[in-house]
Amino acid sequence: MRNLVIALLMLAASPALAQDKEKLSATDLTVRTALTFKVSDTVVQKLLPAGFEVNSPTAGPSKGSNLNMTLIDYLMVQDPEGKPLPPRTTVAMSIPAKKTASGEAVAVVFGGFIAQAAIPGPYFVFGSAKLAVDRQSHTDADGKSIIDETWEVTADDGGALEVQLQFVRGVPARGKAEPKIHSAAKPEFYRIYRFEQAADVVRSTATGIDRVSKCSIKATGPKLALLFDGSEQLISITSIPFYSRSIYVPAI
């Protein structure tokens, strides 16, 4: 009985111990569009810091991809006390990876774009750019919803990114996760996302889903040309009309 009591006390204390090891950094609410690609493994591996290796999904709509581009339209951002922070449109570039020593699956953010006032961003890798997003939704009398999106990035280094999409909205799938995201510039630094989302996969080469009627991706400049040289393969497009996240960092 005594051992059982001790075990129960340890189990009850474990969430508190986890909380002691991390602290809330921010909460936010965003609308996202996530694109995944297959590019040269050699090129992608060179973007990862020592101790990490490419870990492409082996199942699901993004099966076989090794590059993530996440287009983020912030609706609301709050600090740990609930005070508002400036919402900034962001493009984040990351790689599905794993730690070589432990095999732990993580994501590594190696680049992206954000407004000049926010550089180098939370992962110390974002470049300064002017970003704009235009999104339109039309629902007909039969309930069919068509979404048009245009994302435009004009980077201060001369690079540019334009993504134009048109797709038929499906029924989003609700889900939640707690991924750990590392920085390529400071690989020992990471953030933990605890999020809930509604995700609508509108194109996937792995599953055969395709409700996209228009897709144009143009990428130029020193940071993008290495990845988008014409040989890249678009693996999936996921529309995420609802993404609610709490961000935690290790407690110092």
Where do the protein language model's features map onto the residues?
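Hydrophobic alpha-helical targeting segments used for export or membrane insertion
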Residues: I6-L11
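Short linear motifs at secondary-structure transitions and domain/linker junctions
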Residues: T42-L47, N66-D73, L85-P86, P122-K130, ...
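Interaction-surface and assembly-scaffold signal
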Residues: S128-I252
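N-terminal signal peptide c-region/cleavage motif recognized by signal peptidases
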Residues: A13-P15
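N-terminal domain-onset segments
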Residues: Q19-Y74, T205, D210-K223, L227-S231, ...
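Aromatic- and glycine-enriched beta-alpha-beta binding-site module
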Residues: Y74-A155
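Positively charged n-region of N-terminal signal peptides that target proteins for export
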Residues: M1-L4
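Short, surface-exposed linear patches
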Residues: N55-G60, A92, A117-A118, R174-K176
